Swiss-Prot record:
Its main location: virion. It is an enzyme of class 2 (transferase). It catalyses: RNA(n) + a ribonucleoside 5'-triphosphate = RNA(n+1) + diphosphate. InterPro entries: DNA/RNA_pol_sf (IPR043502), RNA-dir_pol_4-hel_dom (IPR042032), RNA-dir_pol_luteovirus (IPR001795), RNA-dir_pol_reovirus (IPR007097), Rotavirus_VP1_C (IPR022071). One of its GO terms (molecular function) is RNA binding. One of its GO terms (biological process) is viral genome replication. This is RNA-directed RNA polymerase.
Amino acid sequence: MGKYNLILSEYLSFVYNSQSAVQIPIYYSSNSELEKRCIEFHAKCVDSSKRGLSLKPLFEEYKDVIDNATLLSILSYSYDKYNAVERKLVNYAKGKPLEADLTANEIDYENNKITSELFQSAEEYTDSLMDPAILTSLSSNLNAVMFWLERHSNDVADTNKIYKRRLDLFTIVASTINKYGVPRHNEKYRYEYEVMKDKPYYLVTWANSSIEMLMSVFSHEDYLIAKELIILSYSNRSTLAKLVSSPMSILVALIDINGTFITNEELELEFSDKYVKAIVPDQIFDELQEMIDNMRKAGLVDIPRMIQEWLVDCSLEKFTLMSKIYSWSFHVGFRKQKMIDAALDQLKTEYTEDVDGEMYNEYTMLIRDEIVKMLEVPVKHDDHLLRDSELAGLLSMSSASNGESRQLKFGRKTIFSTKKNMHVMDDIAHGRYTPGVIPPVNVDRPIPLGRRDVPGRRTRIIFILPYEYFIAQHAVVEKMLSYAKHTREYAEFYSQSNQLLSYGDVTRFLSSNSMVLYTDVSQWDSSQHNTQPFRKGIIMGLDMLSNMTNDPKVVQTLNLYKQTQINLMDSYVQIPDGNVIKKIQYGAVASGEKQTKAANSIANLALIKTVLSRIANKYSFITKIIRVDGDDNYAVLQFNTDVTKQMVQDVSNDVRYIYSRMNAKVKALVSTVGIEIAKRYIAGGKIFFRAGINLLNNEKRGQSTQWDQAAILYSNYIVNKLRGFETDREFILTKIIQMTSVAITGSLRLFPSERVLTTNSTFKVFDSEDFIIEYGTTNDEVYIQRAFMSLSSQKSGIADEIASSQTFKNYVNKLSDQLLISKNVIVSKGIAVTEKAKLNSYAPVYLEKRRAQISALLTMLQKPVSFKSNKITINDILRDIKPFFVTSEANLPIQYRKFMPTLPNNVQYVIQCIGSRTYQIEDSGSKSSISKLISKYSVYKPSIEELYKVISLREQEIQLYLVSLGVPPVDAGTYVGSRIYSQDKYKILESYVYNLLSINYGCYQLFDFNSPDLEKLIRIPFKGKIPAVTFILHLYAKLEIINYAIKNGAWISLFCNYPKSEMIKLWKKMWNITALRSPYTSANFFQD
């Protein structure tokens, strides 16, 4: 019985502890004799419980089932309704309830007042500022904590200390909640006015954050940090996270580098034993002291003290505590403001006439030139993507909101929807579709707004622009991004790199004669001063490009793009404020355009270049690197003398002065040893990531179900754990138990077992062992996987009805006709499937599929259907391979130094033995020749799944496929007849398998799979010339060895003698692997 199942049965007896409660375990087996006993056992249990008899004698009688079969689920039956939480909570509510300081925040509603003081009536009330937006309730969270506390009340020694720390913190939470009563949620897990009116408005979200924090306490330091954040975040709902995390931008500049990793010419990390001294002018210490004083003013005591104590010797060993504080600060929850404040925040900036026009001019010209450089080649060559930009835009049209709800008719069905894709279909059907006209967003048609909430920052607004903007920008932006892909300055987009590569880039040029300048430009991006020069630079670039081509289609594409920029220079937004919708002229850049990321990166690059060109007037230096990454930019400058305190101070002040000449509200810092940007920070020559993902509060409500959210919760827990913030695993498992249970009736619930939730089926939620993805190969595992596959795809009546309507069919046909030179069923079907999949984001379709899936699941969890599926999964392949491997003990010494101090020990150990990788493994098939050939002639982008299907077809069919996509018949013929085609077969299979094995997710993305140290543990005699088989055997061996090392901290070596006769069988099987989509895989993808 795994740990999960043990916790499950204990949890059930904890929650349903009355006389009437019954828990019936349900078992299954792939062995038909044992399966009969399982069914018998279940029937007798149900019968006994109906008659109120004890189940104990049955457990004795059916010992064979309990010992040899696999637990499928537990059926729980209880009359008791939930007032159990309140009853149990009283026992912990022994402390003094917190009192909110009602003057802690500048904006009135951010103070934690009693709800009825903020909202006089139910009509006025909104939960949007405190909605935890997660499909689990405060009462469940309280239950999970009390379950953990009860389970550990008898712990001894060090574990008892953890128990006491958490108990003490929970007493604060329990006492405060108990004073007002536990807020009851409705069926959508929202908290209504009636429930909240006599309680503090932020009680729920505060309690969720506090529970998340207290369940992450292990050491005494954790306890002090958590206590302070829990108590202060009850009152300070606005600036706490920002105050606590501000010092980090300076702390990274204080630690000497003594040995670090740098990126070498081969783009690998290599150790360098260089020593770089941290040179810190007094001014910087004064700024830091001011930050610490601000923390104290806000009532913080222990956290500023810890920072102050660390400052005495600034050691790298003790820096982990600083990085811990930095991560913890985000767990106070999201800062959710009213839209009106979020919007006005950007409009409050004072305009001054006193700006350096020359610098603005240079900035605009740099943007212009960069745009030209990015698009010059595709424009001069009349690139087909720019010619067919409209089609490309339609093919990748998202199903996000189009800003207004419309009544749409699909066949006989009339629906209301805001989705872009549906609006496009409807407009085409009614002749309203005019992609050549970009609708204005002026005072007559103001832009509706979305929001982005993030801990420690103000709420930001997002434009929800009409779909015409997307179509106009899509193709051009794709070309900009493909340029950025091979330009190192764009750290975020640079080809398959990951953050480790960017880390090595910075450390590479740090030395006694260089300094690094790093700037956070998030304020600048959304400031009013940016908008005119920014849009004008883009417009000027587009004008220059228009003169480089004679193709009217390319000119049209560029003109439409230009029109979007012109329209957005005169933009108005609509903001709901109470019952009125205000129209406000909005003169700043906001996210929501397709170009947001690319254009911001271009602008930030232009900005830092402008600044550096001014600095160069005064100092003589060489710019070693310039990088932009999202809202941040940084540059390493190399001087011809050693850097002194005075130099650092002068450069720092000059840079700030230059920014102020542009009236840019940015935070610019200069250091000799480290940087801090939003995504990562480098200190003491090591790389750190902020572990700030909230677990029990979400930013917004999407259409994911409880199962999906349980998988996301687990995935967030894993990411935090890799980054150095660990939450108690038992608590996470308890949350998964709660969130994956399925109600049958009011008093009857079904709880799936570990096997159901960890087997890679369409229902997978978590891994039984953190960081290790297992692919079950035992009979019972394969049996249950097959059973689940039989019910994986669910029909939706609404979706079918929409898809069979003329409107939908015409749209798909329009796309196919525009795309294809000749009919091709694979592509047409692909388009129809993609378009139909987009309907999933329309709630009724989603709910319908979900209901069908839940009812199928309910049937399955009570008795699995034996099902002979002809589908082959990756498990089948691994199952065929496994028997031919022989394991023996091995030894790998630790040979690499640590560069990511926050990693858990077992993961750190593996990296220190086999090394890390600085690249993403290509798992999309885009590196294959066939993919390149298609993109040369067509705007269609086949998925890895489609390529995998196509490449295994007969040669003639591949040729037809290519020709139908516009590849000239002669090229298609050459391709199929060449050796490239057989290499492609291998490449695509490789990508597909990597994709299935999630090799770029979790902690696998950190390991060097091509490490020679790893290779030498594997011995596979070379038998035939089937590279695909050799590949899968090696990959399986590597995963086995790495998983063993993570789990046991020791190494094994594998020998495989794979019979030649089996190879060809395996090879054939490998062309029929089915991909499984599960909440687990979507959660991984969601992390991206």
